[in-house]
């Protein structure tokens, strides 16, 4: 009986230690969500304005930029998968990788070879464990992405896309680089504290649309030196903005998923501690009852012996 009580107390102590860790992680994630949401909101005006400027440029310039032109028979598709660097965030990474696998299968059905790029150690480990090629990976900033990181990723993707313009099947063409004909991104959209959704979107060839108040007046722009030159200079930045927005949404989603997972773990630890405490109290009561019974039995035996 004593050994059972000691084991229960040991388990209560272990559950309490785990609860402290999960509660701390929950509080940290909660504080990061607000900051991540603020960064998402702060980045939107720039994304909106660069989209509007590009739309105005597109109206004024000939739409023949390589990033806008559909290729007749696309053979290779670049897929950027945004995951987390750390775990303990529930089904966050599993959902992203599930959508990525669905896109992978769809591209295969369409006769396209997926070329994988990843952000975050979890996606990198996933593909490395399965011996599947990752063309390039970026890690270490999933919880707090910076624009410089998004720019570096976008530069790599744009370079691969432009290199694919002269490819013929597996022939890399004149530049000697085997590029891609499409670019897709898989990440998690942050909708609310309770809702995040993994999505896959094509980002090249791009379709530029006006973003703003539908009923409001559009801004008139004057372009120097000319619309075509500015269009070519801004389009890669637009792609970097799309990547950065996805990274920010993913960071907010990661923190929200981690908070939800850690809260569930903390609640489970509470329930476990309550159950083990009741069990330990019951065992202790049984032990006391047994000891009292043994004492009473001993007293009665002594009394009987004295009576004789």
From Swiss-Prot:
Alphabetized Gene3D superfamilies for the sequence: 3.40.1380.10, ATP synthase, gamma subunit, helix hairpin domain
SUPFAM superfamilies associated with the record: ATP synthase (F1-ATPase), gamma subunit
Domain of life: Bacteria
Protein purpose: Produces ATP from ADP in the presence of a proton gradient across the membrane. The gamma chain is believed to be important in regulating ATPase activity and the flow of protons through the CF(0) complex.
Family according to the record: Belongs to the ATPase gamma chain family.
GO BP term, example: proton motive force-driven plasma membrane ATP synthesis
Subunit structure: F-type ATPases have 2 components, CF(1) - the catalytic core - and CF(0) - the membrane proton channel. CF(1) has five subunits: alpha(3), beta(3), gamma(1), delta(1), epsilon(1). CF(0) has three main subunits: a, b and c.
Species of the source: Mycobacteroides abscessus (strain ATCC 19977 / DSM 44196 / CCUG 20993 / CIP 104536 / JCM 13569 / NCTC 13031 / TMC 1543 / L948)
UniProt-recorded name of the protein: ATP synthase gamma chain
Coiled coil: none
One Gene Ontology cellular component: plasma membrane
